[in-house]
C-alpha cells in the first residue's frame, strides 16, 4: 500500500491548531515525546493528534516496514538496481553472530579491517610511523569527496573537544585547486600523511587532488620512494593504488555493501580516529549501534526514526512540503546540515519506484538550514512569516564542553524560543495592542500591525542531547540514517542508488575534452550555449 495515497489528504482536514491542542491536553508532551538513552525527542509541536498518529502508524504497518528492516539488517540486497546489500549497520554491530553476504561472513572481515585501521592510527599517533625524512607525522590530509569527505569532516569538527592525538586533520574535496592549496599552505611535506579515499581510485576530483598532492610531495623530496611514507589509501582497486606508489599493506577496504554517504563508520572514518583517537571512534560506533538496536527492536509507536520518517512523509504527502529546515543549536554541528543533505537528498531524490515506474507523488525534499543563532539573523524570517510550508528540526545540546554557562543558556533559550514562536506566532490583536502600549496612535498601530503578524501553527521537532560526545553523536547520525531508510520504504523507492549524479560526470569528461580540442567530436556535439561558454573562457 502506498503511503502517499489519497487517504492521506483527509488528515489535513483535522485542522490541527497547536495552541488549542496544548490547551486541551495537559498530557500532550508526554504522549508525543520519546527518549533513547541520552536523547530526548519532542515531537509535540507537530500538526498531529491521536487520530493522525494512529493513521500514520497503521500506514507504516501496511508498508511491510518490519520485513524491510529485517531484510536490511540481515543482508538482503535491498539496493535492487546495483544488486547490493546495505550493511553500514554491520560496521558498528557489536554482536558476533555470523552475517553472510555472497557466501562470506562479513563480521570477520569487518573485525579484521577495524583492527588494521586501529593499528595504523596507533602507529601514527605514537610516532612509530615516520615520514620519509624520519620525522614524526603531525598533519593528516584526507582527500575525498561526497561521503568520503562530508561525514568525516562533520564528525571531526563536531568532536573537536575530544581531539586527543596532537594530529591536525585537514580535508580536501573540491576539484578547485584552492581546496587543496588551503591545506598545503599550512602543512609540511616531511610531516604530512595523505589519505586517498576513493573506492574506484578514479573519482575525478579525488584523483586530480591526489596527483597534485603527490607532485607537491615529490617536488620536495625528489624521490618516488617517499610516496609510501606519506600516502595511504582506502580503495577496492589495488592495482591503481600500487601504481600510484602506495604500499598495498596500507590500502584499506571499501565494500560494495557500504554506500559512500553511509561510510564514515568504515575505514573512511580513519581521519576521525586520527583526530579523536581510536577508543573514541569506537564510542561513536557504539552510539550508532544503540540506535540500530532501538530501531530494530522497538515498536513503531515508540520508535524515534520511524516517527521522524512518518512526520516528514506526512508533511510531504499531505501538505506538499518541498523542504525541511535543520537547525542545530551548537557551533560544533556547523557541518551537520551539509552531511545530511547528501545522506537525505542523494538517497531519496528519486522519481521512479523500485519497479522503475514513474511515481505520481512527491518524494525527497530539499534539506537545508544552519547553526543557531546565526540563522535567526538570516533565514528565520522566511520560517516565521513566509507562505511556504517548512517543517523544522531543532537540535540542541543540554550541556556544553565549555564553562561559559551564560552563553549556553542564551543559546538554548533562543532555540526553545524559536520553536515556541513557530508554534504560537502572534495575532493581529496581540500586535495591535502591543503597538498601542508602545505609544503609537490607533492609525499608526493599524498600519503596522499587519506587518508584524506571525501566523504560527508551524510544525517543529526538538531533539535534545544531554551532551555532544562521540557516543551521542553516533546515535544522532544513526537516527537520521534510519529515518531516510523508512521514508524510502514508505515511498517505495530505492534509497541506496544515486544514478542521477552519473550523467553530469559523463558530460563533464566530454566537455573537458571539448575545451582542449575544438576539432573533437565532443566539441562538435555541444549545444550552442555550452560552446559559447567555452569560448568566453578561452577568450578571457
Swiss-Prot record:
Source taxon at top rank: Bacteria
Pathway linked to the protein: Carbohydrate biosynthesis; gluconeogenesis; Carbohydrate degradation; glycolysis; D-glyceraldehyde 3-phosphate and glycerone phosphate from D-glucose: step 2/4
EC code(s) of this entry: 5.3.1.9
Main location class: cytoplasm
GO biological process: gluconeogenesis; glucose 6-phosphate metabolic process; glycolytic process
Family matches, as Gene3D superfamilies: 1.10.1390.10, Glucose-6-phosphate isomerase like protein, domain 1
Cited InterPro entries: G6P_Isomerase, G6P_Isomerase_C, Phosphoglucose_isomerase_CS, SIS_dom_sf, SIS_PGI_1, SIS_PGI_2
Reaction(s) catalysed by this chain's protein: alpha-D-glucose 6-phosphate = beta-D-fructose 6-phosphate
Location of this chain's protein in the cell: Cytoplasm
GO molecular function: carbohydrate derivative binding; glucose-6-phosphate isomerase activity; monosaccharide binding
SUPFAM superfamilies: SIS domain
Positions annotated as active site in the UniProt record: 346 (proton donor), 377, 505
Keywords tagged on the record: Cytoplasm, Gluconeogenesis, Glycolysis, Isomerase
Alphabetized CDD domains for the sequence: SIS_PGI_1, SIS_PGI_2
Function of the protein: Catalyzes the reversible isomerization of glucose-6-phosphate to fructose-6-phosphate.
Family: Belongs to the GPI family.
Protein name in the entry: Glucose-6-phosphate isomerase
Amino acid at each position: 500500500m502506498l503511503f502517499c495515497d489519497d487517504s492521506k489528504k483527509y488528515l489535513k482536514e483535522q485542522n490541527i491548531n497547536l495552541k488549542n491542542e496544548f490547551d486541551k491536553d495537559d498530557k500532550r508532551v508526554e504522549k508525543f515525546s520519546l527518549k533513547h538513552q541520552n536523547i530526548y525527542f519532542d515531537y509535540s509541536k507537530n500538526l498531529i493528534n491521536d487520530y493522525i498518529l494512529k493513521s500514520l502508524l497503521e500506514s507504516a504497518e501496511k508498508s511491510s516496514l518490519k520485513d524491510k528492516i529485517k531484510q536490511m539488517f540481515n543482508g538482503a540486497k535491498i539496493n535492487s538496481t546495483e544488486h547490493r546489500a546495505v550493511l553500514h549497520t554491520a560496521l558498528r554491530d557489536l554482536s558476533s553472530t555470523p552475517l553472510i553476504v555472497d557466501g562470506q561472513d562479513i563480521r570477520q572481515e569487518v573485525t579484521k579491517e577495524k583492527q588494521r585501521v586501529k593499528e595504523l592510527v596507533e602507529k601514527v599517533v605514537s610516532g612509530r610511523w615516520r615520514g620519509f625524512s624520519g620525522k614524526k607525522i603531525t598533519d593528516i590530509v584526507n582527500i575525498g569527496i561526497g561521503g568520503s569527505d562530508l561525514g568525516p569532516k562533520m564528525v571531526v569538527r563536531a568532536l573537536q573537544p575530544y581531539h586527543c592525538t596532537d594530529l591536525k586533520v585537514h580535508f580536501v574535496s573540491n576539484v578547485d585547486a584552492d581546496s587543496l592549496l588551503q591545506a598545503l599552505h599550512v602543512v609540511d611535506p616531511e610531516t604530512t600523511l595523505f589519505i586517498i579515499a576513493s573506492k574506484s581510485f578514479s573519482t575525478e576530483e579525488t584523483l586530480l587532488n591526489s596527483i597534485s598532492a603527490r607532485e607537491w610531495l615529490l617536488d620536495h623530496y625528489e624521490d618516488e620512494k617517499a610516496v609510501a611514507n606519506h600516502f595511504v589509501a582506502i580503495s577496492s582497486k589495488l592495482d591503481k593504488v600500487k601504481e600510484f606508489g602506495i604500499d598495498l599493506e596500507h590500502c584499506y577496504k571499501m565494500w560494495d555493501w557500504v554506500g559512500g554517504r553511509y561510510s564514515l563508520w568504515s575505514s573512511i572514518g580513519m581521519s576521525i580516529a586520527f583526530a579523536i583517537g581510536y577508543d573514541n571512534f569506537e564510542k561513536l560506533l557504539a552510539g550508532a549501534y544503540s540506535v540500530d538496536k532501538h530501531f530494530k527492536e522497538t515498536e513503531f509507536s515508540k520508535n524515534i526514526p520511524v516517527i521522524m520518517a512518518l512526520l516528514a512523509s506526512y508533511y510531504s504527502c499531505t501538505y506538499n512540503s518541498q523542504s525541511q529546515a535543520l537547525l542545530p543549536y551548537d557551533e560544533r554541528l556547523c557541518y551537520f546540515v551539509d552531511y545530511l543533505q547528501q545522506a537525505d537528498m542523494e538517497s531519496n531524490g528519486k522519481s521512479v519506484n523500485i519497479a522503475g515506474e514513474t511515481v505520481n507523488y512527491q518524494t525527497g525534499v530539499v534539506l537545508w538550514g544552519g547553526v543557531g543563532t546565526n540563522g535567526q539573523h538570516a533565514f528565520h524570517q522566511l520560517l516565521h512569516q513566509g507562505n511556504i510550508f517548512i517543517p523544522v528540526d531543532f537540535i540542541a545540546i543540554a550541556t556544553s564542553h565549555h564553562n561559559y554557562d551564560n552563553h549556553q543558556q542564551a543559546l538554548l533559550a533562543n532555540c526553545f524560543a524559536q520553536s515556541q514562536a513557530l508554534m504560537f506566532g502572534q495575532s493581529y490583536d496581540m500586535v495591535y495592542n502591543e503597538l498601542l502600549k508602545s505609544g503609537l496612535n490607533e492609525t499608526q498601530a493599524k498600519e503596522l500591525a499587519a506587518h508584524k503578524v506571525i501566523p504560527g501553527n508551524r510544525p517543529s521537532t526538538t531533539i535534545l542531547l544531554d551532551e555532544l560526545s562521540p557516543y551521542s553523536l553516533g546515535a544522532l547520525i544513526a537516527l537520521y540514517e534510519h529515518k531516510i531508510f523508512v521514508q524510502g520504504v514508505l515511498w517505495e523507492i530505492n534509497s541506496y542508488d544515486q544514478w542521477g549524479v552519473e550523467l553530469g560526470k559523463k558530460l563533464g569528461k566530454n566537455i573537458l575534452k571539448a575545451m582542449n580540442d575544438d576539432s573533437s567530436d565532443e566539441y562538435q556535439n555541444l549545444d550552442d550555449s555550452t560552446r559559447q561558454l567555452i569560448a568566453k573562457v578561452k577568450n578571457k
